[in-house]
């Protein structure tokens, strides 16, 4: 495959996924995604499947259900039907059926606390480990829009994360990008999604007029009100931090999450250090209840 062709295909996938995550509360059609990428429906479907190994409709459903699972935990004021609608479901029945198939529990059971059992089945989590985060309070601040170049990774393992960050830094060196802020974007939560299915974005903040090349793409992190948690830890602690934020802090905070992804701004990036320690500010886009 020619380099230009590979770049075009990567851009199609990246533009598509960014669009889905940003508009997950709407009815997203194949026609719409094909128009977005200026290709036929047939070629779009074929390219997305070949590049990601996933069916586009299965991917959209997975993203909808993950967003709903988060909202059921953090939004105590909306009904289950309203949350389903906010995640693109028109029929409460089809939503409940899909949710139970994905997470074992019904939306009602999940909201009443079954999510804690789901998490404990996936991680070695107990009240003692969560107590390490007690007293951790965020700053609430409006964060301006950021422009980033990035690489997307599917399959959340330490080895793969190190490789994708090293490749992004190699690109930065070739483009004479120096001292750019490192940002990790968490479209998929490892709390709810199997490691091998998670999509992670390694990003560098750049000037708005910077144009990437090769398989590197560009995105915008939209302006939003954020809860910002400053934390220093080691590899594996980010997952526990996310559990604390979404399952313990958020329900009592007077805020709720919105559909924009959370992201970490690294002062010390453990994927590029000799040891596995990090320093970061974890940003969670929110709104007042």
Task: Please annotate each region the language model reported.
Residues 3-4, 17-22, 34, 43:
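Recognition helices and adjacent regulatory flanks at domain boundaries
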Residues 1-7, 31, 38, 46-52:
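N-terminal intrinsically disordered/low-complexity leader segments
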Residues 18, 42-49, 54-62, 66, ...:
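A solvent-exposed interaction/effector surface
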Residues 30-36, 55, 69:
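A generic structural signal for ordered secondary structure
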């Amino acid at each position: 495959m020619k380099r230009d062709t590979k770049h075009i295909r990567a851009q199609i996938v990246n533009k598509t996924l960014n669009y889905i995550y940003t508009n997950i509360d709407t009815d997203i059609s194949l026609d719409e995604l094909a128009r977005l990428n200026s290709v036929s429906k047939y070629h779009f479907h074929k390219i997305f499947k070949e590049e990601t190994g996933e069916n586009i409709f299965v991917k959209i459903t997975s993203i909808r259900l993950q967003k709903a699972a988060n909202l059921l935990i953090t939004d105590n004021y909306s009904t289950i039907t309203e949350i389903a609608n906010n995640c693109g479901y028109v029929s409460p029945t089809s939503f409940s059926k899909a949710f139970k198939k994905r997470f074992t529990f019904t939306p009602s059971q999940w909201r009443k606390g079954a999510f804690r059992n789901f998490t404990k089945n996936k991680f070695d989590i107990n009240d003692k480990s969560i107590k390490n985060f007690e007293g951790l309070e965020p700053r609430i601040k409006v964060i301006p829009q950021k422009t980033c170049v990035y690489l997307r990774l599917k399959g959340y393992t330490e080895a793969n994360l190190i490789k994708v960050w090293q490749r992004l830094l190699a690109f930065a060196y070739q483009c004479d990008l120096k001292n750019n802020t490192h940002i990790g974007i968490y479209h998929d939560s490892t709390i709810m999604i199997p490691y091998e299915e998670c999509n992670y974005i390694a990003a560098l903040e750049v000037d708005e007029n910077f144009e990437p090349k090769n398989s590197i793409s560009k995105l915008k992190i939209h302006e939003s009100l954020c809860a910002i948690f400053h934390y220093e830890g080691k590899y594996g602690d980010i997952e526990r931090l996310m559990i604390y934020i979404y399952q313990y802090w958020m329900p009592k905070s007077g805020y709720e999450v919105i559909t924009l992804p959370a992201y970490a701004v690294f002062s010390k990036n453990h994927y590029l250090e000799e040891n596995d320690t990090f320093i970061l500010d974890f940003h969670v886009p929110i709104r007042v209840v």
